[in-house]
Curated annotation (Swiss-Prot):
The protein's name: Na(+)-translocating NADH-quinone reductase subunit E
Organism in which the protein naturally occurs: Teredinibacter turnerae (strain ATCC 39867 / T7901)
UniProt keyword Cell membrane, yes or no: yes
Sequence intervals crossing the membrane: 11-31, 35-55, 81-101, 114-134, 144-164, 180-200
Subcellular location: Cell inner membrane
Similarity annotation: Belongs to the NqrDE/RnfAE family.
Oligomeric form and interacting partners: Composed of six subunits; NqrA, NqrB, NqrC, NqrD, NqrE and NqrF.
Swiss-Prot/TrEMBL GO biological process terms: respiratory electron transport chain; sodium ion transport
Keywords: Cell inner membrane, Cell membrane, Ion transport, Membrane, NAD, Sodium, Sodium transport, Translocase, Transmembrane, Transmembrane helix, Transport, Ubiquinone
Catalytically driven reaction(s): a ubiquinone + n Na(+)(in) + NADH + H(+) = a ubiquinol + n Na(+)(out) + NAD(+)
Function: NQR complex catalyzes the reduction of ubiquinone-1 to ubiquinol by two successive reactions, coupled with the transport of Na(+) ions from the cytoplasm to the periplasm. NqrA to NqrE are probably involved in the second step, the conversion of ubisemiquinone to ubiquinol.
GO CC field: Gram-negative-bacterium-type cell wall; plasma membrane
Membrane topology annotation: Multi-pass membrane protein
Amino acid sequence: MADLIALFVRSVFIENMALAFFLGMCTFLAVSKKVDAAIGLGVAVVVVQTVTVPVNNLLYTYFLADGALAWAGLPNVDLSFLGLITYIGVIAALVQIMEMFLDRYVPALYNALGVFLPLITVNCAIMGGSLFMVERDYNFAESVVFGTGSGFGWALAITALAGIREKMKYSDVPEGLQGLGITFIVVGLMSLGFMSFGGISL
């Protein structure tokens, strides 16, 4: 249990998808103008990560890994080369389901996210979660915790950035840095702040 808690804390703070690996920057910068939209997208990313990483773990463990098909009498088959397209298919299917759900039950959030909701399908933070899971050889329980933690870490980062950007509307930003210029600087400073967690040994 302690290992799972440590993994969750590490994936949220020490190995933050947005501020440590700079994954998912497209939507991270585009949807961080308002806190409400950022929270909505953050929750969507948490849900997608929490489901796709464990599902992809099961697919890799029982179908794609070298020797995974031994249960089917095919111990020498290695389908790991199908990993990327399989993970993308799982992510795309889940995002499509979520898009239909939000369109039906939460239209305000659906309209606020706009084109960036289907773009979660190609959000490299989502794909990164599954690839890190395979690379680090997580088991199913670790995959659930890592998926939830990495999604929560990304949501925390985009919500914090949105809050800062809302406050910056009332700041006297130099003309040449207005818009994405000052946003990149803020993201860099946030990343430096999160680097302080790197000294924590878990």
